[in-house]
Amino acid sequence: MNIHEYQGKQVLAKYGVAVLKGGVAYTPDEAVQVAKDLGGPVWVVKSQIHAGGRGAGRFKNDPNGKGGVRVAKSVEEVKTNVDQMLGQVLITKQTGPAGKEVKRVYIEQGCDIKRELYLSMLVDRATCRVTIVASTEGGMEIEEVAHNHPEKILKVAIDPVEGFQQYHGRQIAFGLGLEGKQVNTCVKFVGALYKAFMDLDCSIVEINPLVVTGAGELIALDAKVNFDDNALFRHKDIEELRDESEEDPAELEAARHSLNYIKLDGQIGCMVNGAGLAMATMDIIKLYGAEPANFLDVGGGATKERVTTAFKLILSDPNVEGILVNIFGGIMRCDVIAEGVVAAAREVSLNVPLVVRLEGTNVELGKKIMAQSGLPIIAADNLADAAEKVVKAVKEAA
């Protein structure tokens, strides 16, 4: 689960992470009041969307204009900038060409920046440990830094048994070139970040940039905080921070029915049981010259109703030109899948090619149900056959 920058800062501040004063606003007048309450002479106006790269982004209605993070040197400038942001679509590297509508802004105190650094925590699958990632190249896309200058990336893995220790913080401080009192400040900063990460079941906490001010302080100038969805049941206060307007409606509907759905940009809808098989299905669709429209794992114990819901989710995407159902029945019975597919196809008046590959428990019964349905369902014998048939059917229907 993602949250907005201002929410992330509020969460981290409770753990002692240093952030600047600021306030959220939903209208230009609210923004003016926040700016007055904070006091000047400089403010930063930040668009709040669930995407990075806002400063370098551009608004759809003004592609050659300013980005989604702007400095204002008067209350009037604050209002003007907020007027230009609210209700507009901001496009960044992470939003894709569709962009995201700005529905709120964050007004923050200005800051005397001496250095910009990078600091994050994440679960490193290679080491199976929470890992601190730091760099002297803050304020930039960390992926670009890692690719072009890997020597500038510092990683420190935390042993889960001993947890965070002060020497971890000192490693980071020295790696970032901090000196004197800044070293102890960094140790406390990183320790607070680690405690928040562990207490709240975060999947990533990213501070980019972490700035050194003219006074030598360490401040989190930005904050990206993501949480493990599987742990939200024990963090009801965090779950309340969810902004569903920032999420894909189809993905939200899928979550309500315990379906794992991620929308993609292709034209072949996929319904599969098992994440590994789903990824293999997407790969083979690409191999045969098409693009998957989604990742959809119905799970091992899906009911007829859940299968019907999954089918509707796929067809809610107007870009879908064909559907491939690929089921290996172990716990999942092929006849249940077949009943769900037939019911869904009838309910939504299917008008795109449908290819179904079934294998496993009750496979013959499943095939019989589809064959007797009277629907134009194309049967496939194996995964390669299924991918080839759905791509061919889509091209012929075009």
UniProtKB/Swiss-Prot annotation:
What Pfam family is a match, any one? ATP-grasp_2
Q: Which gene encodes it?
A: sucC
**Keyword rRNA processing included in the entry's annotation:** no
InterPro entries given in the database record: ATP-grasp (IPR011761), ATP-grasp_succ-CoA_synth-type (IPR013650), ATP_grasp_subdomain_1 (IPR013815), Succ-CoA_synthase_bsu_CS (IPR017866), SUCC_ACL_C (IPR005811), Succ_CoA_ligase-like_bsu (IPR005809), Succinyl-CoA_synth-like (IPR016102)
GO cellular component, as recorded: cytosol; succinate-CoA ligase complex
Q: How does it assemble?
A: Heterotetramer of two alpha and two beta subunits.
The prosthetic group or cofactor this protein requires is: Mg(2+)
Location of the ATP-grasp domain = 9-253
According to its UniProt record, the EC number is: 6.2.1.5
Q: In which pathway does it act?
A: Carbohydrate metabolism; tricarboxylic acid cycle; succinate from succinyl-CoA (ligase route): step 1/1
Q: Which keywords are on file for this protein?
A: ATP-binding, Ligase, Magnesium, Metal-binding, Nucleotide-binding, Tricarboxylic acid cycle
What are the GO BP annotations of this UniProt entry?
succinyl-CoA metabolic process; tricarboxylic acid cycle
Q: Where does Mg(2+) bind?
A: 208, 222
Q: Which GO terms describe its molecular function?
A: ATP binding; magnesium ion binding; succinate-CoA ligase (ADP-forming) activity; succinate-CoA ligase (GDP-forming) activity
User: Per the UniProt entry, what species is this protein from, by scientific name?
Assistant: Paramagnetospirillum magneticum (strain ATCC 700264 / AMB-1) (Magnetospirillum magneticum)
What does the entry list as the binding residues for substrate? 273, 330-332
Cited function:
Succinyl-CoA synthetase functions in the citric acid cycle (TCA), coupling the hydrolysis of succinyl-CoA to the synthesis of either ATP or GTP and thus represents the only step of substrate-level phosphorylation in the TCA. The beta subunit provides nucleotide specificity of the enzyme and binds the substrate succinate, while the binding sites for coenzyme A and phosphate are found in the alpha subunit.
Give a yes or no for keyword ATP-binding in this entry: yes
Residue pairs linked by disulfide bridges in the UniProt entry: none
| Protein name as catalogued | Succinate--CoA ligase [ADP-forming] subunit beta
Family to which the UniProt record says this protein belongs? Belongs to the succinate/malate CoA ligase beta subunit family.
Origin superkingdom: Bacteria
